[in-house]
């Protein structure tokens, strides 16, 4: 295993070469990861919104956005600015505190989840021993915000949408957690860094998707349900509930629900790429690349190049999954609420339990292949 990418050390070393002290250089570094996380997540959402509009247009043989910037790339920015400048209307009979707090509870946990997402061996803000379960626990907060928004709106459609969101989240959170447990069992860790490292050394053949194909499908289906993507968008079904829990919202509060939804979609695709598709792993290890170039692995410019390749690999896998999610929106019809709950409790949960037991048995029988 190579020593990995020490971006922090390279950054501090570069600043020290310009005459700054170690303490000042470290102080400059401290806010950068958090700032980069917020900017990166925001840019990622803008890209996904544009991609969804263009892919949806192609699926329906339309042109899609084309006037706001080249190929319509500024359309998501225009949509955001429009919502920012719209009036924030609060209906008279709502609970104003819960009505305002609901959208915040939807967005904040999703952004916090990016703290444990690695784009490289040391390209992560917080490498926690229970990182992947932190994501699961944070994702379970969002339905509380949706239920709070629906209840406080004093609207029957909004309340039904909030109740559906809570029921849907509870139904699919358990199979998702069981799929993660199978991966943690093979990796002997809940750290996202350790899970990616466990898949390294064998190129594409080392990815967990080959050892956990059923777990991959369970996780991906449950993640789409958590993101409320078609065919699981029951909480905001327009034909049945007007706009669900969003019915009484306007302006930026209305926009926050969509921000949370798209940020969660990108986050879910990132988690899938980390758990099952090798994360940032590049076919050429850092040590071998350094040997070919006849330089030390700790060389700052080599660290930057390797970090960039890791980020590119992670994003390619992530946006490939987002592309699949967008295509599914225009391929599958919406299910009924009873079908949704029956599928989660009567099919997905038993299959997830069997997959976990099978993984445990294979780990004992083939410890080398399954992380014994």
From Swiss-Prot:
NDH-1 shuttles electrons from an unknown electron donor, via FMN and iron-sulfur (Fe-S) centers, to quinones in the respiratory and/or the photosynthetic chain. The immediate electron acceptor for the enzyme in this species is believed to be plastoquinone. Couples the redox reaction to proton translocation, and thus conserves the redox energy in a proton gradient. NDH-1 is composed of at least 11 different subunits. This is NAD(P)H-quinone oxidoreductase subunit 1. Its EC number is 7.1.1.-. The gene is ndhA. It is found in: Cellular thylakoid membrane. One of its GO terms (biological process) is photosynthesis, light reaction. It is an enzyme of class 7 (translocase). GO terms for molecular function: NADH dehydrogenase activity; oxidoreductase activity, acting on NAD(P)H, quinone or similar compound as acceptor; quinone binding. Keywords: Membrane, NAD, NADP, Plastoquinone, Quinone, Thylakoid, Translocase, Transmembrane, Transmembrane helix. It is a multi-pass membrane protein. The keyword Translocase applies. One of its GO terms (cellular component) is plasma membrane-derived thylakoid membrane. It comes from Picosynechococcus sp. (strain ATCC 27264 / PCC 7002 / PR-6). It catalyses: a plastoquinone + NADH + (n+1) H(+)(in) = a plastoquinol + NAD(+) + n H(+)(out); a plastoquinone + NADPH + (n+1) H(+)(in) = a plastoquinol + NADP(+) + n H(+)(out). The keyword Transmembrane applies. The chain crosses the membrane at residues 28-48, 97-117, 130-150, 176-196, 204-224, 265-285, 308-328, 351-371. Pfam families: NADHdh (PF00146). Belongs to the complex I subunit 1 family. Signal peptide: none annotated. PROSITE patterns: COMPLEX1_ND1_1 (PS00667), COMPLEX1_ND1_2 (PS00668).
């Amino acid at each position: 295993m190579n020593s990995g990418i020490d971006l922090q050390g390279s950054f501090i070393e570069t600043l020290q070469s310009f005459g700054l002290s170690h303490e000042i250089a470290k102080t400059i570094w401290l806010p950068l990861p958090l700032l980069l996380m917020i900017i990166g997540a925001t840019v990622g959402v803008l890209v996904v919104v544009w991609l969804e509009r263009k892919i949806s247009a192609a699926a329906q043989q339309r042109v899609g956005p084309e006037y706001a910037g080249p190929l319509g790339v500024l359309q998501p920015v225009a949509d955001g600015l429009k919502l920012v400048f719209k009036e924030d209307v609060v209906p008279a009979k709502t609970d104003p505190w819960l009505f305002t707090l609901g959208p915040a509870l939807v967005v904040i946990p999703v952004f916090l989840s990016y703290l444990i997402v690695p784009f490289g061996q040391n390209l992560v803000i917080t490498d926690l021993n229970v990182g992947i379960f932190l994501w699961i626990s944070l994702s379970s907060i969002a339905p509380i915000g949706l239920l709070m928004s629906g209840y406080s709106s004093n609207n029957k459609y909004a309340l039904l949408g909030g109740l559906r969101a809570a029921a849907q989240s509870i139904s699919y959170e358990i199979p998702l957690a069981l799929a993660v447990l199978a991966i943690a069992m093979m990796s002997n860790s809940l750290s996202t860094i350790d899970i990616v490292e466990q898949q390294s050394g064998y190129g594409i053949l080392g990815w967990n998707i080959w050892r956990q194909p059923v777990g991959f499908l369970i996780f991906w289906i449950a993640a789409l349900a958590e993101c409320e993507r078609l065919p699981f968008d029951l909480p905001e079904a327009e034909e049945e509930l007007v706009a669900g829990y969003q019915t009484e919202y306007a302006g930026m509060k209305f926009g926050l629900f969509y921000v949370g939804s798209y940020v969660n979609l990108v986050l879910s695709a990132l988690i899938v790429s980390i758990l099952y598709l090798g994360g940032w792993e590049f076919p050429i290890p850092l040590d071998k690349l350094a040997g070919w170039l006849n330089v030390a692995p700790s060389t700052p410019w080599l660290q930057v190049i390797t970090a960039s390749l890791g980020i590119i690999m992670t994003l390619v896998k992530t946006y490939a999954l987002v592309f699949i999610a967008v295509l599914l929106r225009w391929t599958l019809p919406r299910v009924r609420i009873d079908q949704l709950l029956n599928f989660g409790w009567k099919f997905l949960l038993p299959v997830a339990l069997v997959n976990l037991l099978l993984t445990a048995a294979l780990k004992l029988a083939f410890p080398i292949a399954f992380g014994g």
